[in-house]
Amino acid sequence: MGRFDQRWVSVVVLAAGIALLPGLLYLFGLALVEGRPQPADRAPSGVAACSSEPRTGFQPMNPWSFATQFFDDDAMKKKVPEVEREAFWIARRHLWRQPRHDMVRWHLSSTALTIWITRNWSAAQIADTARKEDFCRAWSKRRAPDGPMKR
């Protein structure tokens, strides 16, 4: 094999590795999680939704779209959809119930589990579970104009 062929193979292998990296990190992050959370059957009646934001047209996350957000200035400025935020809360709560690990494993597994939840649960299941776990009340206190998260 000539020098040109070796360089070409190296470039192809490098490009394939970069393209596969988000998916491999997602699978590794899921492997770090013990079990998977179960969606709530229905939220208790009388418990308000976290947001009046419409849940139609919800697009499940995937490892590649998540990774590309870091390179897209417009995506970084956009508000995170409530469904994704609620999925993150659910993932975080599930991980709190497991043995603690270092920060890199925590972030990798919470991101992977958030992606998994958005891909395997409906928007209604995510909302019902967030309401049942009482995430909405805690979040609304932080968002209140005079709440603890005031800037």
Predicted features along the sequence, with ranges:
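Juxtamembrane regions of bacterial inner-membrane/periplasmic proteins
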Residues: 2-151
